[in-house]
Every structure is written in C-alpha cells, then in structure tokens.
C-alpha cells in the first residue's frame, strides 16, 4: 500500500505539509490577506503574515482557523488548496491522498468541515487524525504497543493532552489555551503594567526572545516599542524575563492543570508507564522556556521536549496512513 501522499498539520498559527519520502516541505503562517472591496485574495502564508496590523482599510489579513477549528470555511479551503499546490509543485497530475490532523476535542461537525475543505481543495481521499496521535507518531513513539505514553501538544490555538496506548487515546483533553494565548497575555500585561499598546507580532517577539514560565538563573531583558496609552505617542521601554513569567503564569498553569486532570483519569497501569517513561512535549508552544521544568515540578514526572517539536504533528500526520496500513496487514 502506498503511504499518504501528504500530511497536513492544519494549525491555528502555522500550516506544515509533509510529503512521504521528502519530509516537511512547507511551513508557513496560516494567514490570508484579501481585498474587502473585491473579495479577492491578495496573499497567503508568510507574505500575508507580514501584512498583519499593517494593511490599508480595504485589505484585511485574517487567520481562518481559530483555536484549531475552521472559522472561515471558504478562505480555509483556498488556503489548503494553495499550500497543497505549492508543496507538490505544478507538475503533479494525480490528486493526492491527504491526511489532516485536528485537535482531540473537536466535534464531528468540525471534523466534517475540515474533511470537506480538503476534498474541495483537490484531495483524492482524506483521513482525519487527532493531534496527540500524530504528535506521538511524529516524535518517534511506537503507539501500537500496549504501553502508556503521555503527549502534551501545545499549538497556536489549542493544547492537546493525551495518554496513548495500542494506537489510540485512552484519556485525552483539549483546552483552548496555547501559544496565541501566551502572546495575548503579554499584550494585556504590557497594557496594564506599562500603559503600552503593542501588537501581536511584538508580543510574539518578546515571547520568543525572553519569554519564560519558570525563573531563569540569569534574567534577560529586551527593548520593546509600542504606543503610550496616556500620551498616544510612540515609546520604548525595557522588559525583563521576570515580567514575562508574571504575564504568562495564568495561561501556563491552566496547561499544567489540564495535564494533572488527564493523569488523575488515567488507569493505574498506564499511569505507572507514564511515570516511568516521562511526559513528551510537542508543538510550537512547547518551546516556551521553563515549561519542562514547570510541568516536572508540578507533577513530579520527568518531562522532555521532542526532538523536533514544531514538525512532530506534520510528520506523524503523514506517517499515520502507513501506521493504519501496518495495522490492517496484522489483522489479515
């Protein structure tokens, strides 16, 4: 059986495309810019991201996926089509078999919307896979074994936490707190603490450069430019990593609580496996400094980040059909 032609990690923040034999061939922001007057799409991906917060009145840059689900069907369909064509190149005549991952908490209606949009974008066949399963496969875990593995996948819009055994999720939860919420928490903090208005991109920059959710041995600082809410004029201030820890405390503790609640519901044998094997973090949000230490401190379980956290889900999505094929062969 030929494996999946394409695996798509349809993320709120980024879209990654995996092609069998080639690996991850595309990673772009899930942003679309279109002209409000003509309804024509002006840019997709990185080009559109650069327009966020900087567009004239008639051009709007939007994220068609919110918290892991489709918020704008037509735009999502066009975006998927664009990325499939870009990944395969113009020479591809055969419609691809596409597997797409969705957060574990989505409804059947939301799954169907993803499936329909992918078919409409030109897929020959579509397989839907839950994010924690894809993340586990992509991080190199053999999910077919009768052994408990815990995955915490922190994306842009959702965090998926699951204990996986024998190819499926035994206990899972999906919370709408993730990387985007880290950015929003920083925006709110800057407004409240410093009377400074900053945009999403600046907040993301602060998070990447000095963001932490656990005390650093050596605190760091960064210069931040924004608009003073009192005078209305541009202003530059110095922000420390300790302030980001304060800003991110509420969001990160909600993720820790979700991990805790999944562990509480896990059957004892599988919980013992997790205690033995540790917790694996995947997704772009897992790159936030201090997250490993915070989860480890609060659960008492060894916590580690996967080797390629950003691409785990895309790789696992692409390899999922091969996993299913292997399972089918075993049954016959």
Locate each region found by the language model.
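Nucleotide/phosphate-binding catalytic cleft detector across ATP-hydrolyzing
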Residues: 1-154, 162-280, 286-332
């Amino acid at each position: 059986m030929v494996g999946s032609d394409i695996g798509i990690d349809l993320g709120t923040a980024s879209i990654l495309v995996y092609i069998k034999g080639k690996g991850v061939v595309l990673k772009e922001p899930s942003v679309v810019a279109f002209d409000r007057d003509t309804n024509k799409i002006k840019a997709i991906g990185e080009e559109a991201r650069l327009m966020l917060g900087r567009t004239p009145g008639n051009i709007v840059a939007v994220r068609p996926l919110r918290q892991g689900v489709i918020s704008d069907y037509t735009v999502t369909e066009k975006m998927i089509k664009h990325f499939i064509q870009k990944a395969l190149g113009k020479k591809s005549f055969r419609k691809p078999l596409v597997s797409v991952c969705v957060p574990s908490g989505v409804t059947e209606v939301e799954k169907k919307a993803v499936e329909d949009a992918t078919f409409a974008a030109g897929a020959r066949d579509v397989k839907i896979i839950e994010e924690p399963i894809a993340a586990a496969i992509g991080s190199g875990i053999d999910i077919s074994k009768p052994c408990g593995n815990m995955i915490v996948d922190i994306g842009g819009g959702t965090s998926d936490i699951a204990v996986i055994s024998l190819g499926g999720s035994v206990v899972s939860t999906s919370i709408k707190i993730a990387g985007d919420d880290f950015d929003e928490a920083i925006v709110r903090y800057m407004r409240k603490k410093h009377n400074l208005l900053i945009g999403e991109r600046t907040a993301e920059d602060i998070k990447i450069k000095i963001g932490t959710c656990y005390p650093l041995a050596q605190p760091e600082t960064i210069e931040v430019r924004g608009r003073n809410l009192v005078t209305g004029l541009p202003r530059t201030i110095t922000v420390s990593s300790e302030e980001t820890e304060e800003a991110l405390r509420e969001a990160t503790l909600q993720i820790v609580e979700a991990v805790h609640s999944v562990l509480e519901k896990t059957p004892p044998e599988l919980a013992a496996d997790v205690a033995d094997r540790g917790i694996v973090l995947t997704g772009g949000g897992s790159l936030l400094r201090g997250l490993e230490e915070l989860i480890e401190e609060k659960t008492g379980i060894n916590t580690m980040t996967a080797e390629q956290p950003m691409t785990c889900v895309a790789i696992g999505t692409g390899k999922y059909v091969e996993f299913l094929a292997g399972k089918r062969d075993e049954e016959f």
